[in-house]
Amino acid sequence: MTTALIFAGGTGRRMNSRSKPKQFLEMHGKPIIIYTLEYFEYHDDVDTIVVVCIREWIDELKGLLKRFGISKVSRIVPGGETGHDSIYCGLKSMKDICKKDDIVLIHDGVRPLITKQLITQNIEAAKKYGNAITSETARESIVRSTDGEIICEVPPRSQMYTAKAPQTFYYGKILDLYERAKRDGKKSIDSAHLCNLYGEAMHIVVSTPNNIKITEPADYYIYRALYEAMEGQQIFGL
């Protein structure tokens, strides 16, 4: 079985949106979270979806699922204090529906320009290599600094990637890593970071360049422009 675990627990403080969290902001009458969920809803290889959501917005999400016909969501789980905690909450909630050798795709609810092909590539790579980390090749030079003032390293751009999502694993393995982190008192930025903390080898699936995460106000307008451009291509057959 393949499960999509969608993280929609962020409050979106950087979006300066006081009325609602960023994942519930609308474009053309549809919330961002629904655009994201639809890709997994309509993918033949995804059997079920689990969503981690802000507790106060769970009822709102339930209404949206019904309104937009999202039927694969089997449960909605309250999030934790951090992204790490929220993913762990989601993984724990799946113990009664997932076997150790099932596949789980961990994805951001505010990353709505994923593609069917990228989901397929993640599933296939995870089955073959044990995991799949969607990553984009670096377009500009990346520098490293330990104090925020002095550059101590400029790694070769050809070796640099940006980790994105989905990040896909065997369920038993990724759950074990989060449980180890809890015992050890460790926190991670994302699941790829957690794998690195424990010395796990990871396999790259190259991302599409438009697989953006909506974090700040400018991201929303970039997303809208990209979405409308893709819609225009379909309408005019470009």
Model region roles, listed by residue range:
Residues 211-238:
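Hydrophobic helical membrane-anchoring modules
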Residues 98-110:
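Short beta-strand-to-loop acidic/aromatic patch adjacent to the donor-nucleotide binding site
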Residues 26, 113, 168, 213-214:
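Short aromatic/basic micro-patch
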Residues 113-205, 238:
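Conserved core of the sugar-phosphate nucleotidyltransferase
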Residues 15, 40, 61-65, 122, ...:
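Hydrophobic packing residues within well-ordered alpha-helices of enzyme cores
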Residues 6, 33, 90, 108, ...:
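Residue-level signal for inorganic ion chemistry
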Residues 2-59:
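N-terminal glycine-rich phosphate-binding loop and ensuing alpha1 helix
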